[in-house]
Design a protein with these regions (language model features):
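Active-site phosphate/pyrophosphate-binding segments
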Residues: 2-38, 131-133, 139-143, 147, ...
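Glycine-rich phosphate-binding loops that contact phosphosugars or nucleotide phosphates
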Residues: 33-176, 181-184, 218, 253-254, ...
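Short alpha-helical basic/polar micro-motif
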Residues: 105, 230, 321
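Short, well-ordered loop/turn and helix-capping segments at boundaries between secondary-structure elements
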Residues: 165, 238, 268, 287, ...
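Short basic/hydrophobic patches in alpha-helices and adjacent helix-turn junctions
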Residues: 234, 280-283, 325
Length: 371
């Protein structure tokens, strides 16, 4: 299984998880219902944090409580006091992330309510918390995770829906409507797989140039922008930055010259401001893209299916994942520079046994998917 295979598998896995949605999140719903929690704090880094940022606004709307998303380092050093009376959810897809494990150790030492979410409940993370939950990824054997990102967004959304029902903030009719909205977002993700693949095929040469990239998005799509920048950086090995819309035009845009990659993710309801920014920048660099559910026929637009606004990251993520997977495969840019590789052990981010776990996942992938 290659990275692109997992990108294209995501909507299938999300669809399967939707069919068992109540069961999937039942334990976490029971936990938040049984405690006197006033807030939710998600502690995660990298792609898991970006997925949480994609779902944060949805969670706040559904649960009607404050939801914060912080890195493990920030949590341990600064962000552990407020919000008070919070349920802490620490996320590590691999279950081997040393920074997330350190955050869980802090929670345990300070008697803080904590749950770990992972795709591998037998990983070392299980030794550092009392409650470890599988969020439904199944098998993903590629380091540059994509399937796990969308599945985590979906899991958090489902937790918001059923948690909201348990807390009395969503009635039965609201649950049904929200599940339908999620189903439509998953279908939109499938559509965007094809849209993105066609886009890359049509723009292979310009996407293959080693130039900086800037990705812009607001709300849930800020999480998508974060993840897009990460994927472009780690796979194609280009400098990639992420910004909110107005932050972008308050200085960062001043570096743009012809040849830059600029991706602007439109607000779900359609933003005249973002559309105007994209129009302006298309006169500076021909590699400007406006990802929008409200296209007006301009050459730099890529159309996205309309979905419920707070679920917009679900179809938008796949566009960037597809670019990263296809261009990295074409350029064979998976490996880091030899000098960086030589010192990588000094910057290790995974607990002992991680490489063996990846090999085990590859064997499972061959068994599960026949690839």
């Amino acid at each position: 299984m290659k990275m692109l295979d997992y990108v294209q598998l995501a909507h299938v896995r999300m669809g399967a998880n939707l069919e068992r949605s109540s069961e999937l999140v039942a334990q976490l719903v029971d936990i938040i219902q049984s405690g006197s929690f006033d807030a939710l704090r998600i502690v995660a880094s990298g792609s898991s944090r970006h997925a949480a940022d994609c779902a944060r606004d949805y969670l706040q709307d559904a649960l009607q409580m404050q939801v914060s998303v912080v890195t493990p380092e920030a949590f341990v050093d600064f962000e552990h006091t407020y919000p008070q009376h919070a349920l802490n959810i620490a996320v590590s897809q691999s279950g081997y992330s040393t920074n997330t494990i350190a955050a869980l150790d802090y929670m345990r030492a300070h008697d803080m309510a904590a749950v770990a979410l992972t795709a591998n409940v037998e990983a070392p993370i299980k030794e550092h918390t009392d409650i470890v939950l599988d969020y439904g990824v199944g098998v993903e054997s590629v380091d540059f995770v994509t399937l796990g990102v969308e599945v985590l967004v979906e899991y958090l959304v489902l937790f918001g829906i059923y948690g909201g029902q348990a807390r009395g903030t969503i009635d039965a009719k609201g649950v049904a409507q929200r599940l339908d909205d999620l189903r439509e977002a998953i279908q939109a993700n499938a559509v965007m797989c094809k849209t993105a693949e066609a886009y890359v095929q049509d723009h292979m040469l310009e996407l293959s140039e080693h130039t900086p990239a800037m990705v812009v998005g607001n709300g849930p799509n800020y999480g998508a922008a974060e993840e897009a920048a990460l994927k472009l950086s780690e796979t194609i090995k280009i400098p990639a930055m992420h910004h909110e819309g107005e932050e972008f035009v308050h200085g960062p845009e001043m570096q743009i010259v012809p040849g830059y990659l600029v991706f602007i993710v439109d607000d779900p309801q359609g933003s005249e401001r973002l559309a105007n920014i994209a129009d302006a920048l298309s006169n500076v660099t021909t590699k400007t893209v406006l990802l929008t559910a409200h296209p007006k026929g301009r050459a730099h637009e890529v159309a996205v299916p309309q979905v419920a606004p707070l679920l917009s990251a679900i179809p938008n993520l796949v566009f960037f994942q597809t670019i990263a997977a296809m261009i990295a495969e074409r350029l064979k840019s998976w490996d880091v520079h030899p000098y960086l590789d030589a010192v990588s052990k000094q910057m290790e981010v995974k607990a002992e046994g991680y490489e063996e776990s990846v090999n085990a996942l590859k064997a499972k992938a061959a068994e599960c998917y026949g690839m």
